[in-house]
């Protein structure tokens, strides 16, 4: 036995669409105040792209690029998620796949001199720890402590310059640990 359904009248389908449209419109209107809060929450996130180098040691100089995603917990404290690609360039200047390392890690920063009305610059003290992922002849755990200048941190694009001390604890036999001064320049978005 086959049961046949009656076709729905057109006014019922139209009523259903109107109800659905009204609910969608109401949800958008009620979410409008939340968008302003989300925008202020997004203002706490920043991304930095940078280049850095260190002083030569044992005929080797580190040079690399980094990506730093940071979140401001308060006006002074920030959390950082870091990714660094570093080449350990020997004295002859040759770069090979085996003398590079990609490190992931995190860190903390404290704004020691926040921006003021007269001066838009800020100075941050940062500490970070990263460790090599994947296979590399230069596997290491890197520890950094530095002072960073951030030009106008309230702007969407700000220059960032850092100087500090870096220590790389190599896990490969035959490699001496690296320690020395480093300089970093970049841009904050």
Region locations from a protein language model:
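Short, highly charge-biased, low-complexity peptide segments
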Residues: 162-170
């Amino acid at each position: 036995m086959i049961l046949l359904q009656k076709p729905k009248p057109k006014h019922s389908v139209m009523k259903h669409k109107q109800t659905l449209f009204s609910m969608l419109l109401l949800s958008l209107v009620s979410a409008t105040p939340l968008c302003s809060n989300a925008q202020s929450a997004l203002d706490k996130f920043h991304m930095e792209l940078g280049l850095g180098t260190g002083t030569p040691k044992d005929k080797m100089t580190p040079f690399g690029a980094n990506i730093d995603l940071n979140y401001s917990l308060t006006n002074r404290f920030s959390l950082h998620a870091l990714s660094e690609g570093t080449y350990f360039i020997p004295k002859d200047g040759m770069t090979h796949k085996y003398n590079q390392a990609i490190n992931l890690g995190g860190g903390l920063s404290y704004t020691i001199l926040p921006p003021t009305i007269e001066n838009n610059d800020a100075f941050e003290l940062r500490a970070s720890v990263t460790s090599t992922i994947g296979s590399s002849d230069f596997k290491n755990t890197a520890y950094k402590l530095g002072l960073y200048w951030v030009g106008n941190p309230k702007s969407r694009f700000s220059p960032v310059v850092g100087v500090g001390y870096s220590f790389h604890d190599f896990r490969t036999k035959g490699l001496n640990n690296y320690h020395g001064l480093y300089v970093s320049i970049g841009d904050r978005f």
